[in-house]
C-alpha cells in the first residue's frame, strides 16, 4: 500500500469504529436530534471531508457532474432528511470502494513497474587512463567504453570489446533463455549480465537505446484508448448530468402530485447513489491497463488499448515467411549420398569445393563440416547460375544445381525437398545430393493451430519459390500462400486481403520488422516479431514481440480476447444492476443500502473482474 492508501485506511477504520459506537449509543440512549446530528457529523467529516472538498472544487471549476458531486449531494441530503446513519454509511462504503479501486490500479501498475525495472540506474564509464566512474546513462556519449559487472543491467546498446558472459533477457522477452556474448557481439540495454565482466563500446546514446524506446512505448500505451474506453468516457459525460436531472424530477414532481416530500427526496437521493458510474469509468480502463501489463510480462508490447481491442477482432493473420515462421538461417537439413559414398565424404567434398564462395549456401555447407583445411582446395571457378568447379586434393569437384550436372554430363539422381538442392560430383562420379533449407521455427506450427482454433484465417506471403513456399505452408498448416513476391507485391496482396476480409474483422500482418515497415503500417494491426534490438520494428509496428517465438502471436490474441470479454462482462453487469436498482428506487422498493450495493458493490465486483487480466499464468 502507498502512504496515501494507508492514510485512507486509517480514516476508514476510525470512521467505522465511531459509526458502530454511535449506532450502539443511540440504540440504548435517546438524545435530542441536534446532539445526534453533531455526533454523526464527526465520523461523516472524518471519512468524507475530501469528497466534499472535491465536489465543491468541481462546482467552482464548472465540472460539477462527477462521482464526488453525486456522493456529496446524496449523503448531505440523507443527513438533512434525518437519516444520519445512512448518510455516514454511504460515504464510508464509498470510500472503502475507492480504496479498493486505488489498490487494484496500483497492483496493475506494478506489472508495468516490473517492466520499468529494466531501466538502468547508472553506468560504469571507463576513462582513457583506465579509471572507472559511475555516471548517469544519459551522460554517456556514443563511442564511450563502459564496464558491466556480473549482476548489473547493461545500460546502453553497444558492442562487446572484451570479456565473455551470459546475458539474461527475461525482463525484455518474458522468457529466461540465456544468451552467450563474446567480443564483437552486439548487446542491447536492459539485459542483465549474469557472470563475466564485459567492456562495451556504446553505439547509441541512452535516449535512442532499446530500453528507452521500450519504456517510452509502455508508458505512453495508456494514451491510446480503445474505442470502447472512449465510448464509456463520453457516456459518463452525458449520463451523470442526465441522472442528476432525473433525481431532481423524482424529488419534485411526484410529491407535488402525491405529497410525502421526505419519502420522495430519499428515493431521489438513493437514485443518485445508485447512478454513480464508477464501476464503468474505473473498471474498463483498468481492464485494458491490466491486459497491456500482463502482455508486457510475456514480452508482448502493445502500444495502446486501441490495438488490443483491434487484435481481438482479427479475422485474417498474414505472415512473412523468412525470419518470421522460419529462422532465416540456411542449414544442411538432409543428405542423400550415392551408393558407396559416405555422408562425411559427400559433405567434405562439397564444403571444400565451396570454400572460396561467400554465398549463404556455401556458408551453410562449411558450417556443416567445420575444421577443414581450405588449403586443400584450389583453382575455384564459379559458373554463374550453375555452381562451382574446384580442385580438391588434385581432383575436380563439382558442386551446384542440376544444370551443372547436365552441362558436365554427370549421371546424377534427381532429388526433391523444401529448399535448395546441391548436387556433388568428383572426377565425373556422382557423390550425392545435399538439401539446404531455411529451418522452420519449432513453435510455428503450434502458432498456426492456435490462431485457426480462434477462427483466424492464416496467409503466408513470401519471395521464395512457389515449390518451397507450398511445402512450408503445408507443413505448418497455413490456409493460403502466395510466393515469388517482391516487397511491393506484398503491399498489393495486403491491400487485396483487406478488401476481402469479413465485415467488422481486422487484418494483422506479422513480420520481422526488417523489410516489412510498409506492410506493417498498411495492415489494421502491424505485429513485429523478434524486435529485440530492432528500432525499425519498434517504430513501425502496433504490437511488438520481443523474441522470435511465433506462439506469442496466438498468445497475444488470447490476451486481447479475454480483455474484451471482461470489458463487456463489466459493462453488461454494471448497467443491468444499476438499471434494475434505479427502477426499484424510483418505485420506493429499495432504500439507501441497496444504493450502496448498486454503487460500491458493483464497482468492487467489476474491479475484481478487471484484475483477472493481470494473471498471466493461465495464458501459458
Where are the language model's segments positioned?
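N-terminal membrane topogenic signal
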Residues: 1-16, 239
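Bilayer-spanning, highly hydrophobic alpha-helical transmembrane segments
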Residues: 15-18, 230-261, 267-288, 568-597
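Juxtamembrane helix-loop transition segments at the membrane interface in multi-pass membrane proteins
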Residues: 56-65, 100-113, 286-305, 611-620
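Conserved catalytic phosphorylation-site environment of P-type ATPases
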Residues: 72, 172, 231, 266, ...
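Conserved ATP-binding TGD loop and adjacent catalytic N/P-domain core of P-type ATPases
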Residues: 392-394, 420, 426-569
Amino acid at each position: 500500500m502507498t502512504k496515501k492508501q494507508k492514510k485512507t485506511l486509517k480514516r476508514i477504520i476510525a470512521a467505522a469504529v465511531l459509526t458502530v459506537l454511535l449506532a450502539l449509543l443511540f440504540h440504548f440512549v435517546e438524545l435530542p436530534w441536534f446532539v445526534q446530528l453533531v455526533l454523526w457529523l464527526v465520523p461523516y467529516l472524518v471519512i468524507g471531508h475530501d469528497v466534499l472538498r472535491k465536489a465543491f472544487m468541481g462546482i467552482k471549476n464548472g465540472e460539477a457532474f462527477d462521482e464526488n458531486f453525486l456522493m456529496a449531494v446524496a449523503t448531505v441530503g440523507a443527513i438533512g432528511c434525518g437519516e444520519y446513519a445512512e448518510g455516514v454509511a454511504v460515504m464510508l462504503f464509498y470510500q472503502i470502494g475507492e480504496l479498493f479501486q486505488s489498490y487494484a490500479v496500483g497492483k496493475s501498475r506494478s506489472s508495468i513497474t516490473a517492466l520499468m525495472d529494466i531501466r538502468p540506474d547508472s553506468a560504469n564509464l571507463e576513462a582513457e587512463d583506465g579509471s572507472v566512474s559511475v555516471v548517469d546513462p544519459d551522460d554517456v556519449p556514443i563511442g564511450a567504453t563502459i564496464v558491466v559487472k556480473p549482476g548489473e543491467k547493461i545500460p546502453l546498446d553497444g558492442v562487446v570489446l572484451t570479456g565473455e558472459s551470459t546475458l539474461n533477457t527475461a525482463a525484455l522477452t518474458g522468457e529466461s533463455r540465456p544468451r552467450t556474448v563474446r567480443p564483437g557481439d552486439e548487446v542491447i540495454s536492459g539485459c542483465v549480465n549474469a557472470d563475466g565482466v564485459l567492456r562495451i563500446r556504446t553505439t547509441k546514446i541512452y535516449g535512442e537505446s532499446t530500453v528507452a524506446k521500450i519504456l517510452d512505448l509502455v508508458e505512453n500505451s495508456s494514451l491510446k484508448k480503445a474505442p470502447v474506453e472512449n465510448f464509456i468516457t463520453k457516456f459518463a459525460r452525458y449520463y451523470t448530468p442526465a441522472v442528476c436531472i432525473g433525481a431532481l424530477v423524482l424529488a419534485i414532481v411526484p410529491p407535488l402530485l402525491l405529497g410525502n416530500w421526505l419519502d420522495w427526496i430519499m428515493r431521489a437521493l438513493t437514485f443518485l447513489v445508485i447512478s454513480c458510474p464508477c464501476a464503468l469509468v474505473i473498471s474498463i480502463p483498468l481492464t485494458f491497463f491490466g491486459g497491456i501489463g500482463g502482455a508486457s510480462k510475456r514480452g508482448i508490447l502493445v502500444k495502446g488499448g486501441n490495438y488490443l481491442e483491434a487484435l481481438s477482432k482479427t479475422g485474417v493473420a498474414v505472415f512473412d515467411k523468412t525470419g518470421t515462421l522460419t529462422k532465416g538461417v540456411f542449414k544442411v537439413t538432409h543428405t542423400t549420398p550415392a551408393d558407396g559414398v559416405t555422408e562425411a565424404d559427400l559433405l567434405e567434398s562439397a564444403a571444400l569445393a565451396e570454400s572460396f564462395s561467400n554465398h549463404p549456401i556455401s556458408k551453410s555447407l562449411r558450417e556443416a563440416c567445420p575444421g577443414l583445411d581450405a588449403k586443400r582446395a584450389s583453382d575455384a571457378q564459379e559458373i554463374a547460375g550453375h555452381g562451382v568447379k574446384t580442385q580438391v586434393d588434385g581432383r575436380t569437384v563439382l558442386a551446384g544445381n542440376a544444370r551443372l550436372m547436365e552441362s558436365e554430363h554427370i549421371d546424377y539422381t534427381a532429388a526433391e525437398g523444401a529448399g535448395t538442392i546441391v548436387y556433388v560430383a568428383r572426377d565425373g562420379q556422382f557423390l550425392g545430393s545435399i538439401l539446404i533449407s531455411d529451418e522452420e521455427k519449432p513453435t510455428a506450427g503450434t502458432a498456426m493451430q492456435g490462431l485457426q482454433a480462434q477462427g483466424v484465417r492464416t496467409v503466408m506471403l513470401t519471395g521464395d519459390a512457389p515449390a518451397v513456399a507450398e511445402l512450408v505452408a503445408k507443413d505448418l498448416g497455413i490456409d493460403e500462400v502466395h510466393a515469388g513476391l517482391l516487397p511491393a507485391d506484398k503491399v498489393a496482396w495486403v491491400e487485396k486481403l483487406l478488401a476481402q476480409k469479413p465485415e467488422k474483422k481486422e487484418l494483422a500482418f506479422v513480420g520481422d520488422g526488417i523489410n516489412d515497415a510498409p506492410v506493417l503500417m498498411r495492415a489494421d494491426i502491424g505485429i513485429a516479431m523478434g524486435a529485440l534490438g530492432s528500432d525499425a520494428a519498434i517504430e513501425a509496428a502496433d504490437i511488438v514481440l520481443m523474441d522470435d517465438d511465433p506462439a506469442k502471436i496466438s498468445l497475444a490474441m488470447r490476451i486481447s480476447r479475454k480483455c474484451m470479454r471482461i470489458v463487456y462482462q463489466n459493462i453488461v453487469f454494471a448497467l443491468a444492476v444499476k438499471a434494475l436498482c434505479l427502477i426499484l428506487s424510483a418505485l420506493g422498493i429499495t432504500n439507501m443500502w441497496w444504493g450502496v450495493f448498486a454503487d460500491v458493490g458493483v464497482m468492487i465486483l467489476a474491479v475484481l473482474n478487471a484484475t483477472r487480466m493481470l494473471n498471466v499464468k493461465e495464458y501459458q
